[in-house]
Swiss-Prot record:
Its main location: membrane. Optimum temperature is 20 degrees Celsius (at low osmolality). One of its GO terms (cellular component) is plasma membrane. Residues 1-28, 611-630 are annotated as: Disordered. The chain crosses the membrane at residues 47-67, 85-105, 125-145, 177-197, 230-250, 267-287, 299-319, 354-374, 385-405, 436-456, 479-499, 510-530. It is a multi-pass membrane protein. Involved in the uptake of osmoprotectants. Can transport betaine and ectoine. Na(+) is probably the coupling ion. Belongs to the BCCT transporter (TC 2.A.15) family. The keyword Transport applies. This is Betaine/ectoine transporter LcoP. Induction: Expression depends on the external osmolality. Induced upon hyperosmotic conditions, resulting in an increase of its transport activity. The gene is lcoP. It is found in: Cell membrane. Residues 17-26 have a biased composition (Basic and acidic residues).
Amino acid sequence: MSTNSGNNLPESQESPEEPHYPHDTHPGLVPGISVDAQRNKFGLDKTVFGVTAALILAFIAWGISSPDSVSSVSSTMFSWAMTNTGWLLNFVMLIGIGTMLYIAFSRYGRIKLGTDEDEPEFSRFSWIAMMFGAGIGVGIFFFGPSEPLWHYLSPPPHTVEGSTPESLHQALAQSHFHWGLSAWGLYALVGGALAYSSYRRGRVTLISSTFRSLFGEKTEGIAGRLIDMMAIIATLFGTAATLGLSAIQVGQGVQIISGASEITNNILIAIIAILTIGFIISSVSGVSKGIRYLSNLNISLTLGLVLFVFITGPTLFLLNLIPSSVLEYGSEFLSMAGKSLSWGEETIEFQAGWTAFYWAWWIAWTPFVGMFIARISRGRTLREFALITMAIPSFILILAFTIFGGTAITMNRENVDGFDGSSSKEQVLFDMFSNLPLYSITPFILIFVLAVFFVTSADSASVVMGTMSSQGNPAPNKLIVVFWGLCMMGIAVVMLLTGGESALTGLQNLTILIAIPFALVLIVMAIAFIKDLSTDPAAIRQRYAKAAISNAVVRGLEEHGDDFELSIEPAEEGRGAGATFDSTADHITDWYQRTDEEGNDVDYDFTTGKWADGWTPESTEEGEVDAKKD
């Protein structure tokens, strides 16, 4: 069918043979398919689980038995990686932002992350709150006061002099660069690709599923399993780094409250063990709702602590600093993104300690955060999803870092003890609160918040890894979930041990090494995502509409001058709206052929939602799945 100027086909012309489509539905008319409406058969992927588990257990055993050996090898590999592949980390962060901005403002922006009928499950406020909760953690406390202070005292190479008004704004811009759009652009890329793949294309929720447009059925073979194994390993190390930071920060709080002279690695390991017990209890006892409530309380306490510092700290100074730091961040963004080996050895050292670690950390967190964001974003348009996911959480974190960092820098300017650069990063937080009201209470609140972040992060990340090792099962076996949680704790311990006296060094080095290969996965994912969108039913309709109107207007002017109107009727072969588009190609139609649990084709009526063999989905409560578990 085509839109033309109104000319009928010659009576002598035979109609072309009707094309055959799955379920007699043109690819431009498919309303979308949700993974929930598919007849998937889940089970433990023994290859993904077995190989990944063996590698991780071997690494943990090596790290515990010979931490010096791990430290030596990782340091050597780290030096090589920073010299030769540091540019890759910068590049992938820009890819995330660029891809999502392109999608948001292109013709793909109107495509839904779901079927045509799907509406958002959550209000916009609740959606943003949950999204923000997924992307923040202990880092806002560990680095919030200390990072801006550090950059203020020792600015990045080739920028400004330290302890000056210029370094104040440079310090906050650098912190915003690390925690703002770059991180959330990458989360949006992975979350958007997963949500589209699962709720628009009906694929199982696996990282490998997002590559279907490029690799076809190979995503269900060795190539797909390799991608999922890399995603699990990245998540393990990224979350383990977070757990290690939590332990370090909690240890500092325990030291302050107890009056202990020093917190050793043995004490940090004991803290990890205690918090691990809390994670295991939450995983196996069915208190998931309680954990969610606790997580919501934690977010409220976090924002409350930020507001507390804003009110009791240098409020007027902070009000002036917020817009200044945001504008400085915007003006310096490309300059900061362009720093690499070409700027010299000092820049490489700065990148290794700060920027590269953050990029690696965010890359390693993308499977975890991306999968969570995907699950709560169903029914949103890609334009709304991309813009809000990148902008709102970034702005909230920018506010938090400006308030914490601006307060710490103010205390340095006022010569308050502990803010001259001599204190450790974990100590600066407690030093800041010690100079504000209610210090008899705030250390306990901070320890509680940090501990809950530990448990909830471990719990959520373990479920994600359980899903990835169970063929996309959204409710994986609890023993698998606990196993991955214990592996995270083991890696966190190894990271602390390999860091020696500076535990943070071990966390940073290993996180960067693991993230570099997964960065390549994310670049290819961006390409696959765009290719997927190019054959979306909505994109096909837009293509036909553009061709039909263009053809009809030209033909109308040629044959009727000013006096013509558009109508819909059969067009001559080769002159229709779809003349240059093969709507029957396998890569256009294969995805919406419905199958049963064994993968056999089954007819389906998209209008009525009925299967030809009479199958109907069982009525299940939230969190349950119609699946066969190993």
